[in-house]
């Protein structure tokens, strides 16, 4: 009996009415090239319609557990951030519930982990992330960067997938530097202060912003990418130096928690919106970041832990680099404490650790490969004389 000519099992057509047939492992089941192409288009449409936020929303405990792997200390801040981020994305998963957006304000000295917290959150949730410096922004019409360029960075990090960018996180640092010069509205234009707050206010509270795809200043003949910011989580950070005096005047205390002594660590400073308004933030701007999270100054012990404990700790990174050369690198506690002490003296917190350690390690990393040593012990004197660590390693190995 003659077998019928093969046809596409989806559209029923046979060549040459349709393209080539692809045979299935199942008997007499085929699909034509045209149907394959249509199926790909349908899948692409479904992909575009799918939610662009986190693929799975972790619980607050899971979020904090992940932060613990990268950020030392700051327990209260990590708990507050975990809950805030969880609620933000839960709100997006349930759009029928009328829950307002709650942006976050991080207050803490330089180098306490504000940027790291925001970055780690975005990476864990697998959402686009962008960092901006508030001091580079100006209101329209002045020399500087338009606030829409903040969203351009987010778009770039989302590979210009607008829907995905609209579920992202933006961290704006140095937000305290755009405070107006006094609590009363200025009679003159304040290019770096109130005007920038007003410009940022629009995108933070939720609007459709026109983003220039090439960056730079907007001009009339340029094409724009519309980005809806209502679901973008904005995390604002700043040191707010001098805010302690405003709080002190309000609560009538002599010490209140910005300077890092033992008592201050036990009694965290509580900043209220009125304090921020007195500092120079406009009321509308403060109202758009209702969650105020405070970070403690870091102690010497905190900095030693930062060097060794996080998943990507500096010490672990250097040890791995030396291990690739067949060398075991060990740091003494005295050396680590001295690195922490020097960073503390610089007043740059955790940011100073890498600069101090890198300066000491660069000569060692230059000379150690091919030296034949199997173990290097890096002690306190080696911070200023790093090659002595290599000499001592050779002597130990020879004896």
Curated annotation (Swiss-Prot):
SMART domains: AAA, ClpB_D2-small, zf-C4_ClpX. Gene3D superfamilies: 1.10.8.60, ClpX chaperone, C4-type zinc finger domain, P-loop containing nucleotide triphosphate hydrolases. Belongs to the ClpX chaperone family. Component of the ClpX-ClpP complex. Forms a hexameric ring that, in the presence of ATP, binds to fourteen ClpP subunits assembled into a disk-like structure with a central cavity, resembling the structure of eukaryotic proteasomes. CDD domains: RecA-like_ClpX. Pfam families: AAA_2, ClpB_D2-small, zf-C4_ClpX. Residues 1-51 form the ClpX-type ZB domain. It comes from the Bacteria. ATP binds at residues 109-116. ATP-dependent specificity component of the Clp protease. It directs the protease to specific substrates. Can perform chaperone functions in the absence of ClpP. GO terms for molecular function: ATP binding; ATP hydrolysis activity; ATP-dependent protein folding chaperone; protein dimerization activity; unfolded protein binding; zinc ion binding. This is ATP-dependent Clp protease ATP-binding subunit ClpX. One of its GO terms (biological process) is proteolysis involved in protein catabolic process. The keyword Chaperone applies. The keyword Nucleotide-binding applies. NCBIfam families: clpX (TIGR00382), PRK05342.1 (NF003745). Keywords: ATP-binding, Chaperone, Metal-binding, Nucleotide-binding, Zinc. It comes from Thermus thermophilus (strain ATCC 27634 / DSM 579 / HB8).
């Amino acid at each position: 009996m003659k077998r019928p000519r093969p046809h596409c099992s989806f559209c029923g057509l046979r060549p040459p009415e349709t393209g080539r047939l692809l045979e299935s492992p199942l008997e007499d089941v085929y699909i034509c090239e045209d149907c394959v192409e249509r199926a790909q288009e349908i899948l692409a449409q479904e992909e575009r319609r799918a939610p662009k936020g986190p693929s799975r929303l972790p619980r607050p405990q899971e979020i904090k557990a992940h932060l613990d792997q990268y950020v030392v200390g700051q327990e209260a801040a990590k708990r507050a951030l975990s809950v805030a981020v969880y609620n933000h994305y839960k709100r997006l998963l349930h759009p029928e519930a009328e829950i307002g957006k709650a942006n976050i304000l991080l207050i803490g000295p330089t180098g306490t982990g504000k940027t790291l917290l925001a970055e780690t959150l975005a990476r864990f949730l697998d959402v686009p992330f962008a960092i901006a410096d508030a001091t580079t922004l100006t209101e329209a019409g002045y020399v500087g960067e338009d606030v829409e360029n903040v969203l351009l960075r987010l778009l770039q990090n989302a590979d210009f997938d607008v829907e995905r960018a609209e579920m992202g996180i933006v961290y704006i640092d140095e937000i305290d530097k755009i405070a107006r010069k006094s609590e009363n509205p200025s009679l003159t234009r304040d290019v770096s202060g109130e005007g920038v707050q007003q410009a940022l206010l629009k995108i933070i509270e939720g609007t459709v912003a026109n983003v220039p795809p090439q960056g730079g200043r907007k001009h009339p003949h340029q094409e724009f990418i519309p980005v809806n910011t209502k679901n973008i989580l904005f995390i604002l950070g700043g040191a707010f130096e001098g805010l302690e005096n405003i709080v002190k005047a309000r609560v009538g205390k002599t010490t209140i928690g910005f300077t890092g002594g033992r008592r201050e660590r036990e009694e965290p400073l509580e900043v209220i919106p009125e304090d921020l308004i007195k500092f120079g933030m406009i009321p509308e701007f403060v109202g758009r970041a209702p969650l105020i999270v405070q970070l403690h100054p870091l102690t010497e012990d905190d900095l030693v832990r930062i060097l060794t404990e996080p998943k990507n700790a500096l010490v672990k990174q250097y040890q791995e680099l030396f291990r690739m050369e067949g060398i075991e690198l060990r740091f003494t506690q005295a050396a680590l404490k001295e690195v922490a002490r020097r960073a503390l003296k610089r007043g740059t917190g955790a940011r100073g650790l890498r600069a101090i350690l890198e300066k000491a390690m660069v000569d060692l990393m230059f000379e150690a490969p091919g030296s034949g040593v199997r173990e290097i012990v890096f002690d306190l004197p080696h911070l200023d004389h790093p090659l002595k660590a290599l000499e001592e390693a050779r002597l130990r190995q020879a004896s």
